[in-house]
A protein has these predicted regions:
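Charged, amphipathic alpha-helical linker segments immediately N-terminal to NTP-binding catalytic cores
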Residues: 78-135
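Glycine-rich, often proline-containing surface loops adjacent to acidic residues and nearby aromatics
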Residues: 115-122, 145-153
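N-terminal flanking helix/linker immediately upstream of nucleotide/cofactor-binding cores
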Residues: 138-142
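Loop/turn-to-beta-strand initiation segments
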Residues: 176-177, 208-211, 241-247
Length: 266
């Protein structure tokens, strides 16, 4: 990139150099690139722009805090092939993680931005004990790249249950491809797809996901179709393919067995 030129008269060289060196943001840059006092004079505008831009990043803790005009981009200075200082832009670490997670969402019935919100991280660790030791153990095994079939957890608090499943997806999305669905909403989507096509698009995405998180089973309008053609189809196929499935419901396994035991006329 073209070198920026000093656009005002230098009256006090020492003052100019010290002004730049006083900045904690610039100090680290000077140290990393071995920037000389002469280079500070020559590239004063460049360094000032760097300082102003990176001050916006000082208190940033997530993508929600980003104040850059170009979302997720960080202003940088480096040396080119001729060892001359030049500016460029790079993706910040927060955006790298954000982009990775976004790319790894296979299918969801939820707002993607809710799943990508960095507040999910702290929520998961603050409330993880609600999931129980067995469920937590399966999640930890996944983070160690161990084979996990899945786990079930019963949580009566619907808001807590939903938030925990979303925060679980946030944790897993950094290294895994994940689908997360509220089952009743997913059924509505599949039904609408059947009206315009064979209805298998969303169903296959969910079945083939590396990890699937299902929230709220038992809360849908249960029919033989929703049970046999959708829910059991998803679970049976995923078991055969040895895919990981996490299920969360307000009902216990015994209660779910009774709910899904339909009359023979269905």
């Amino acid at each position: 990139m073209k070198q920026l030129k000093l656009n005002y008269q230098i009256e006090d060289v020492n003052s100019l150099v010290n002004n730049i060196k006083d900045s904690n943001i610039i100090k680290k840059l000077i140290e990393n690139l071995n920037i000389t006092d002469d280079e500070i004079i020559t590239h004063y505008d460049l360094l000032s722009s760097y300082q102003l831009s990176n001050e916006k990043c000082q208190n940033c803790r997530s993508m929600k805090d980003c104040k850059q005009s170009t979302f997720g981009m960080k202003y940088c200075i480096k040396r080119d092939d001729q060892n001359i200082l030049t500016d460029s832009f790079t993706i910040c670490n927060y955006y790298k993680d954000y982009y990775t997670r976004k790319k790894n969402i296979v299918y969801t019935t939820f707002n993607e931005e809710d799943l990508l919100d960095d507040s999910q991280k702290n929520f998961f660790y603050d409330n993880v004990n609600f999931l129980g030791n067995e469920f937590i153990g399966k999640v930890l095994s996944l983070t160690k790249n161990e084979k996990v079939n899945g786990a079930f957890v019963q949580l009566n608090n619907s808001k807590l249950r939903l938030r925990l499943m979303q925060s679980l997806s946030y944790k897993l999305l950094l290294n895994h491809q994940v689908s997360i669905i509220k089952f009743s909403d997913f059924l509505k989507t599949v039904k609408s797809e059947f009206k315009i096509s064979d209805g298998t698009s969303s169903l296959q995405e969910v079945i083939n996901s590396e990890i699937l998180i299902i929230d709220g089973i038992g809360n849908e309008s249960i029919t033989s179709w929703s049970r046999d053609e959708i829910l059991l189809s998803i679970l049976d196929n995923r078991i055969q393919m040895e895919k990981t499935t996490f299920i969360c419901s307000e009902y216990s396994l015994e209660q779910l067995k009774k709910l899904y035991k339909l009359s023979y006329n269905d």
